[in-house]
Amino acid sequence: MIAVIVIAGVVAVIRASGGGTKIAGRPASSGPTTTLRDGAVAGIDQAPPATAAPPRPAASAPVALAADPTAAADQLAIAEVTIREPNASPNELDAAAHLQQVAYRRLGQHPELYDMIISRAPAALRTAVAHNLYARNDLALIPGGPLKDTLPAWRIVAPARQSELLADYRDAQQQFGVGWNYLAAINLIESDMGRIEGLSSAGAQGPMQFMPSTWDSYGAGGDINAPRDSIMAAARYLAHNGFADGNVDGALYAYNNSQHYVDAIKDIAAVLALDPFAYRAYYRWEVFYVTTLGDVHLPVGYDTPERIPAADYLAAHPEAG
């Protein structure tokens, strides 16, 4: 078994006070993965399909999310289009991914607004927006205890290169029959694609959050903290639990014993299968930790060996609130 219920990555970070509300109507998954004949992943190695009459692309500088939900939904739509713009600069992608992440974190807490939010997106992107909203809702429903007024004993580091992680996901898919998009989704939720270094409250470790005893069985002698070794071990574990034989839900549930976790992974994987260009946005998502004082941004360079008061950190770093 991997980390049960409490995860050190995005699950722990994105949970909102009061939890979420289980909602129906999740869009159908579009299959394990989407690949091209030559082995390239559609949308990453080739230009994404154009959307009809897209809004003007997002600015390259960070933009604050509007307080009005409709205006925020319009900003999210612009960010989603920019992410899929083949000529978007790295700065534009950074800004769009940040706005996208903040929008889903905030708007995702309000299922009563989902229909409105989805309708504001271009038609070609509405399924992806719906999957992201449902994933946010499911992550909020994973039990994790009361919110704390302290920040975790973590070290936040830059992730491995986007291309290197993608190559690792692909290699694992080829070797073990586990879709690259599922591995990317797990890596995102467990450790924000390797940004979080530190133990979960359950004692799980590394980019894919293995318990040491499970690592002994599936790590193949590798380094639990090495991205490639951890990704390969996750694929090995999922394959052992039936993923490659079609038991996707069962394999994911074995990885983390929560149906909400399973559903969230499947939603994110579905976005990547529908349009893998979305990967370059997920790769840019940063670490936020929910406290009694609200979301706190933990940037690369955050490093504390023990929990610290959130109020003290925010006083020293007001931009993190």
Regions found by a protein language model. Give the residues of each.
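Extracellular mucin-like PTS domains
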Residues: 29-36, 50-52
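N-terminal export signals and maturation junctions of secreted/periplasmic proteins
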Residues: 13, 18-26, 56-59, 63-66, ...
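Hydrophobic alpha-helical membrane-insertion segments, chiefly the h-region
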Residues: 4-16
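Non-catalytic protein-protein interaction scaffold segments in large eukaryotic complex-forming proteins
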Residues: 41-53, 57-65
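Intrinsically disordered, low-complexity segments enriched in small/polar and acidic residues
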Residues: 24-29, 37, 42
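Extended low-complexity, intrinsically disordered tails
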Residues: 8, 19, 297-321
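Catalytic glycan-binding domains that act on GlcNAc-containing polysaccharides
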Residues: 112-299, 309-315
